From Swiss-Prot:
Residues 1-25 form a transit peptide. Mitochondrial RNA cytosine C(5)-methyltransferase that methylates cytosine to 5-methylcytosine (m5C) in various RNAs, such as rRNAs, mRNAs and some long non-coding RNAs (lncRNAs). Involved in mitochondrial ribosome small subunit (SSU) maturation by catalyzing methylation of mitochondrial 12S rRNA; the function is independent of MTERFD2/MTERF4 and assembled mitochondrial ribosome large subunit (LSU). Targeted to LSU by MTERFD2/MTERF4 and probably is involved in a final step in ribosome biogenesis to ensure that SSU and LSU are assembled. This is 5-cytosine rRNA methyltransferase NSUN4. Belongs to the class I-like SAM-binding methyltransferase superfamily. RsmB/NOP family. It comes from Homo sapiens (Human). GO terms for biological process: mitochondrial RNA catabolic process; mitochondrial RNA modification; rRNA methylation. The active site is at 310 (nucleophile). Its main location: mitochondrion.
Length: 384
């Protein structure tokens, strides 16, 4: 019976006239109309292969395969939730608080006279900053964050290397702080976790990105802090901040728009390597210099600025720092000093892989055993 049924189906298919199928039900996907001929992710990889193979030499194949592999994350504990309970839950997953573990280890070394680097108090953002990661080589993933008993999310998943610029900023209690390019909001949230900001200005030019920032603040920060005088969210042109609020801030974070190297290899949406964004990409270093210069102008004499990107490119990293310092010296007679952050390599070497040949600043490079980054950061002090 089954054989007869199968034979009947075959005979029926032979008799079906496909021409009788209504045109609206027939569709042949036109590849050229639906997919770009040269996807932006492929253009990004071609660009990186040409430039980074020269910049990094024998290191590039390792960095390349890591960039193309799954990224590793850290869980930033929300101190506005029941942080001790949250920390205990993360410890049960065999994750470790890499910030406080590194600080404790560094303090023991300093007390034993094994290190000549600055004490943790001189560079650590705050002992209240807690971020959990899995050990090197452990590719476990954190479960999605959920609202806790206090009504805010318990932790924020982020590239743990993104916390290093905040740590490098060295916040002190009562600081007036500016996050010049704040969206989507991970570093802004980290700044608030320190408990050191008397006032925090969080700015971004893009309305859509500001909406993402507001969403994070609403999910993680209590209403009385979010809507009070402590946090101010603006959508101004960051390049003009030196004119708007010059000589105002104790600490400024300048996390500039960049080629977002890892994102550019995985996502077509909002990819800066799209052919239509070629000019925008070419002038990125100019924009970055302008933003860093504005951040330095907004800082009080004696204050500190940290410049950061999530790009490997020295054109967007060291060259921008040097260009902004020269610009301020020549046009404003303002002297800026780059601060040494080499101790960050030793303090956090168990968690991150650092590139050892930066001219100024520090660079976390992706590595299969510790697949964070890329993250470049450089600390400066405005002298005059």
């Amino acid at each position: 019976m089954a054989a007869l049924t199968l034979r009947g189906v075959r005979e029926l298919l032979k008799r079906v006239d496909l021409a009788t199928v209504p045109r609206r039900h027939r569709y042949k996907k036109k590849w050229a109309a639906t997919e770009p001929k040269f996807p932006a992710v492929r253009l990004a990889l071609q660009n990186f292969d040409m430039t980074y193979s020269v910049q990094f030499g024998d290191l590039w194949p390792s960095i390349r395969v890591s960039l193309l592999s799954e990224q590793k994350y850290g869980a930033l504990v929300n101190n506005f939730a029941a942080w001790d309970h949250v920390s205990a839950k993360l410890e049960q997953l065999s994750a470790k608080d890499f910030v406080n573990e590194a600080i404790s280890h560094w303090e023991l070394q300093s007390e034993g006279g094994q290190s000549a680097a600055p004490s943790p108090a001189s560079w650590a953002c705050s002992p209240n900053l807690r971020c959990f990661t899995f050990d090197r080589g452990d590719i476990s993933r954190f479960p999605p964050a959920r609202p806790g008993s206090l009504g805010v999310m318990e932790y924020y998943l982020m590239d743990a290397a993104s916390l290093l610029p905040v740590l490098a900023l060295g916040l002190q209690p009562g600081d007036i702080v500016l996050d010049l390019c704040a969206a989507p909001g991970g570093k802004t949230l980290a700044l608030l976790q320190t408990g050191c900001c008397r006032n925090l200005a969080a700015n971004d030019l893009s309305p859509s990105r500001i909406a993402r920032l507001q969403k994070i603040l609403h999910s993680y920060v209590p209403e009385e802090i979010r809507d009070g005088n402590q946090v101010r969210v603006t959508s101004w042109d960051g390049r003009k901040w030196g004119e708007l609020e010059g000589d105002t801030y104790d600490r400024v974070l300048v996390d500039v728009p960049c080629t977002t190297d890892r994102h550019s290899l995985h996502e077509e949406e909002n990819n800066i390597f799209k052919r239509s964004r070629k000019k925008e990409r070419q002038i990125l270093p100019v924009l970055q210099v302008q933003l860093l210069a504005a951040g330095l102008l907004a800082t009080k004499p004696g204050g500190h600025v940290v410049y950061s990107t999530c790009s490997l490119s020295h054109l967007q990293n060291e060259y921008v720092v040097q260009g902004a310092i020269e610009l301020l010296a020549n046009q404003y007679s303002i002297q800026v000093q780059v601060e040494d952050l080499t101790h960050f390599r030793r303090v956090f070497m168990d968690t991150f892989c650092f590139f050892s040949s930066c001219q100024v600043g520090e660079l976390v490079i992706p590595n299969l055993m510790a697949n964070f980054g890329p993250m470049y950061f450089c600390k400066m002090r405005r002298l005059t």
